[in-house]
C-alpha cells in the first residue's frame, strides 16, 4: 500500500538529488526519437515550407520548427515530473481528472472555438494563437492517474470481489471516452481500454475477467463486420457512391452501429483496397505501402523520397499519421529498424522499471504508460504497412503534434519518477 504522506512531502528536494539515480537509457532513446521526428517532419513538409519566407514569423508557421518548441516544452515537463515523487499524483489525481474534463466539454460546444477547432468535420482542438490544444491527450493522463489511484486503494482479486472497483473504473474511463467519441475522435478513445486492462492485469485481477473481456471484444468485432456488410448492401441497393455520398447510411433508417460512414469506408478499403474506391478511400494507405516498399535497404535519401515530396502521400498526413512511411522510404529498412529499436528500448525499459517499482502504485503507473505507448507504436506502424485499418493514431515523439508530444513527455516523466523513487531516499 502507498505510504500516507502529504503531497508537499513528495515534492522534490533538490539538495538530495545526488543521492538518487536517473535512468538515462530511456531519455536518450526519447531524445533520438524526437530528433528523428523533427528531421522527417521537415522532409515531409519541405515542398510546403519552401515558400513561407524567413524570419521568426515564418518559422512559427513551419511544423518542424514548432515541433522543436514542443519538444523543448516537453523536455522541461519531463524533468519537472521526474523530480516529483510519483506518489504525489495520487493525492491530486481526482482534481486533475476534473480539470481535464472541462476542455472535453468545451470543445463540443458548436462555434465556441471558431472554425480553427474543426478539422475534417471533427471538433478536437481548441485554438491558442498559432498553436492548438487537444483535450483528449490530457484526458489519457487523467484516466491513467485515476485508474492507478483506484487500483491501489481497492481490493483486487476475483471478479466478484472487484465489482465495485470495476464499476468505478468503468465510470472513470467511460466519461472521457464518450466525450472523445462525440468529437468524434475514435483513435484517441480506443487506446484507453488497453491501458486500463494492462493496469488491471498487473493488479492481479482474476483471469476470468480478461476471458470475458476477450469474448466481448470478439462479439464487438462480429457486430462491426455485420454492420459494415449491411452498409455495403445499403449503398449498392440505393446506387450510392462510397466516396461521394458520405453520410448517406448514417442518415438512413436502417438499424446500425454508431459508426460514421468514413469509418466504415476505412474498414472496407482495408479488407479490399482494390474494389472500394482505391483512388479515394484507400489512397493514403496505398501510397503509404508504396513508400515503405520503395525504400529498399538504405532508402532514397533524406528529403529525396518521391511519395511525400511530390504529394502522392498527402502532405496533410505525411508529417503526422504516416510519418513512418516517410522514414521507410527515405532511410529504408535500416532506418525503420533503428526507429523500432529505439521504441523497443523505451517499452522494454518501461516494463523493467515496473518490475523494480517500490510499490503497486509505481508498477501500475509504469505498466499503464508502457501499454499506452505500445498501442500507439503498434497501431501506427501496422496502419502504415496495411496490417490494420487507418485509425490516425500518431507515433510517439515522431509524429507532429504539440499536445501529443508534451503529454508523452509527461507520461514518460512519470515512469522516470517511478525509477528514481524505487528506494526511499528520505
Language-model segments: residues:
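Alpha-helical transmembrane segments of multi-pass membrane proteins, especially transporters
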Residues: 164-169, 213, 364-372
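Interfacial segments of multi-pass membrane proteins
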Residues: 190, 195-209, 306-335, 393-401, ...
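Hydrophobic residues within the alpha-helical transmembrane core of Major Facilitator Superfamily
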Residues: 105, 140, 197-198, 374, ...
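Hydrophobic, glycine- and aromatic-enriched re-entrant/interface helices and adjoining loop segments
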Residues: 117-125, 212-333, 360
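Hydrophobic alpha-helical transmembrane segments
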Residues: 68-77, 330-347
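Hydrophobic alpha-helical segments of polytopic membrane proteins
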Residues: 94-95, 100-101, 166-179, 186-255
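Membrane-helix boundary/helix-loop-helix interface segments in multi-pass membrane proteins
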Residues: 2-33, 39-184, 244-247, 381-394, ...
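Loop-to-helix entry and N-terminal half of a specific, functionally important transmembrane alpha helix
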Residues: 350-391, 398
Amino acid at each position: 500500500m502507498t505510504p500516507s504522506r502529504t503531497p508537499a512531502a513528495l515534492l522534490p528536494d533538490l539538495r538530495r538529488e545526488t543521492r538518487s539515480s536517473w535512468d538515462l537509457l530511456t531519455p536518450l532513446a526519447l531524445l533520438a526519437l524526437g530528433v528523428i521526428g523533427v528531421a522527417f517532419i521537415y522532409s515531409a513538409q519541405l515542398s510546403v515550407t519552401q515558400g513561407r519566407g524567413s524570419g521568426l514569423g515564418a518559422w512559427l508557421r513551419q511544423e518542424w520548427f514548432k515541433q522543436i518548441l514542443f519538444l523543448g516544452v516537453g523536455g522541461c515537463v519531463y524533468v519537472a515530473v521526474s523530480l516529483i515523487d510519483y506518489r504525489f499524483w495520487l493525492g491530486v489525481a481526482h482534481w486533475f481528472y476534473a480539470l481535464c474534463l472541462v476542455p472535453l466539454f468545451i470543445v463540443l460546444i458548436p462555434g465556441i472555438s471558431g472554425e480553427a477547432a474543426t478539422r475534417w468535420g471533427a471538433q478536437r482542438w481548441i485554438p491558442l494563437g498559432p498553436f492548438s490544444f487537444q483535450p483528449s491527450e490530457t484526458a489519457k493522463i487523467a484516466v491513467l492517474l485515476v485508474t492507478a489511484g483506484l487500483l491501489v486503494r481497492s481490493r483486487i482479486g476475483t471478479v466478484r470481489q472487484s465489482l465495485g472497483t470495476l464499476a468505478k473504473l468503468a465510470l472513470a474511463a467511460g466519461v472521457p471516452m464518450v466525450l472523445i467519441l462525440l468529437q468524434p475522435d475514435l483513435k484517441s478513445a480506443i487506446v484507453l481500454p488497453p491501458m486500463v486492462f494492462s493496469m488491471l492485469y498487473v493488479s492481479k485481477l482474476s483471469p476470468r475477467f480478461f476471458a470475458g473481456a476477450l469474448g466481448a471484444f470478439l462479439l464487438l468485432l462480429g457486430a462491426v463486420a455485420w454492420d459494415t456488410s449491411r452498409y455495403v448492401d445499403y449503398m449498392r441497393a440505393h446506387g450510392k457512391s462510397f466516396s461521394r455520398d458520405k453520410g448517406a447510411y448514417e442518415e438512413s433508417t436502417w438499424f446500425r452501429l454508431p459508426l460514421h460512414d468514413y469509418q466504415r469506408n476505412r474498414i472496407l478499403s482495408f479488407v479490399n483496397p482494390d474494389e472500394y474506391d482505391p483512388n479515394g478511400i484507400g489512397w493514403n494507405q496505398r501510397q503509404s505501402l508504396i513508400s515503405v516498399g520503395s525504400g529498399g535497404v538504405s532508402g532514397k535519401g533524406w528529403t529525396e523520397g518521391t511519395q511525400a515530396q511530390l504529394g502522392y502521400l498527402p502532405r496533410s498526413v505525411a508529417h503526422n499519421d504516416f510519418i513512418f512511411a516517410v522514414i521507410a522510404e527515405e532511410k529504408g529498412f535500416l532506418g525503420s529498424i533503428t526507429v523500432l529499436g529505439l521504441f523497443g528500448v523505451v517499452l522494454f525499459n518501461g516494463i523493467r522499471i515496473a518490475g523494480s517499482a517500490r510499490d503497486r502504485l509505481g508498477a501500475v503507473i509504469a505498466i499503464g504508460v508502457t501499454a499506452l505507448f505500445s498501442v500507439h507504436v503498434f497501431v501506427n506502424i501496422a496502419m502504415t504497412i496495411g496490417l490494420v485499418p487507418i485509425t490516425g493514431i500518431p507515433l510517439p515523439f515522431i509524429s507532429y503534434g504539440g499536445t501529443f508530444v508534451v503529454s508523452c513527455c509527461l507520461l514518460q516523466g512519470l515512469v522516470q519518477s517511478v525509477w528514481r523513487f524505487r528506494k526511499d531516499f528520505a
